């Protein structure tokens, strides 16, 4: 479980250098992070350490992370955002 201060740092890390990533990652954090289990939360935090071009490639479905935790988290993020569109 993360403290409020840690969650504030995680939220700040959700702010990316690419607007396209901001509109995908931030809503997922705000709406889903607390419902993730501890491992998924760690995977999400670890995913935020990846470079923007890699994240963009994975989110757009043009590639897949070799890290299984990252790949699963990207799948969750994409599914969450698709559910909001439909």
UniProtKB/Swiss-Prot annotation:
InterPro entries: SDH, SDH_sf, SdhE_FAD_assembly_factor. It is found in: Cytoplasm. GO terms for biological process: succinate metabolic process. It comes from the Bacteria. GO terms for cellular component: cytoplasm. Its main location: cytoplasm. Gene3D superfamilies: Flavinator of succinate dehydrogenase. The keyword Chaperone applies. The keyword Cytoplasm applies. It holds the Pfam family Sdh5. Keywords: Chaperone, Cytoplasm. An FAD assembly protein, which accelerates covalent attachment of the cofactor into other proteins. Plays an essential role in the assembly of succinate dehydrogenase (SDH, respiratory complex II), an enzyme complex that is a component of both the tricarboxylic acid cycle and the electron transport chain, and which couples the oxidation of succinate to fumarate with the reduction of ubiquinone (coenzyme Q) to ubiquinol. Required for flavinylation (covalent attachment of FAD) of the flavoprotein subunit SdhA of SDH and other flavinylated proteins as well. Belongs to the SdhE FAD assembly factor family. This is FAD assembly factor SdhE. It comes from Vibrio parahaemolyticus serotype O3:K6 (strain RIMD 2210633). The gene is sdhE.
């Amino acid at each position: 479980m993360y403290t409020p201060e840690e969650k504030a740092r995680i939220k700040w890390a959700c702010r990316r250098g690419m607007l396209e990533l901001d509109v995908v990652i931030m809503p997922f954090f705000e709406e889903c992070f607390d419902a993730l289990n501890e491992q998924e939360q760690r995977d999400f935090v670890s995913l935020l350490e990846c470079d923007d071009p890699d994240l963009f490639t994975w989110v757009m479905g043009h590639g897949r992370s070799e890290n299984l935790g990252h790949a699963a988290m990207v799948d969750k993020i994409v599914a969450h955002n698709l559910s909001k569109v439909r």
